[in-house]
């Protein structure tokens, strides 16, 4: 079983990343290489609602950064990249519908995993290298028992 929430999140996303791009998930680092996917932490244990002597509803925020080839031509490369990133968002939504969640520590019960937007952001381009970064912002909402 993973030791921390960070371990759980990496273990949760890594099989999907390997399936999609045949490479490991980068953690808190987004490489300048096409077809790379990074997991970037935003915040953890943010309290949404506190229950005295019971625990708290909390959230774990993160971003998925997808680096794809970028084109300044009138081809469909950028559209294909956007559709790839959108499909990753759709996969996150599907996992929530199936209630297939990361394996957080025993004192935590996940309520949902969700995208915080309805489409990926074009987070930046490197025209010289022909790369674009697409960002998906997400969160896990969970209940953590007081220990």
Regions found by a protein language model. Give the residues of each.
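Charged, amphipathic alpha-helical segments and their flanking helix caps
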Residues: 1-28, 46-147
């Amino acid at each position: 079983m993973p030791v921390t929430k960070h371990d759980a999140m990496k273990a949760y996303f890594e099989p999907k990343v390997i399936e999609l791009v045949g490479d490991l998930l980068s953690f808190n680092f987004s490489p300048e290489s096409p077809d790379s996917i990074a997991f970037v932490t935003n915040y953890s244990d943010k309290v949404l609602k506190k229950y005295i002597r019971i625990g708290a509803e909390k959230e774990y925020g993160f971003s998925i950064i997808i680096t794809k080839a970028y084109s300044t031509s009138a081809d469909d490369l950028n559209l294909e990249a956007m559709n790839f990133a959108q499909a990753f968002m759709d996969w996150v939504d599907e996992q929530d519908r199936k209630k297939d969640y990361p394996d957080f520590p025993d004192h935590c019960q996940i309520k949902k995993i969700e995208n915080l937007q309805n489409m990926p952001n074009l987070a930046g381009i490197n025209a010289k290298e022909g790369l674009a970064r697409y960002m998906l912002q997400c969160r896990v909402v969970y209940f953590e028992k007081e220990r």
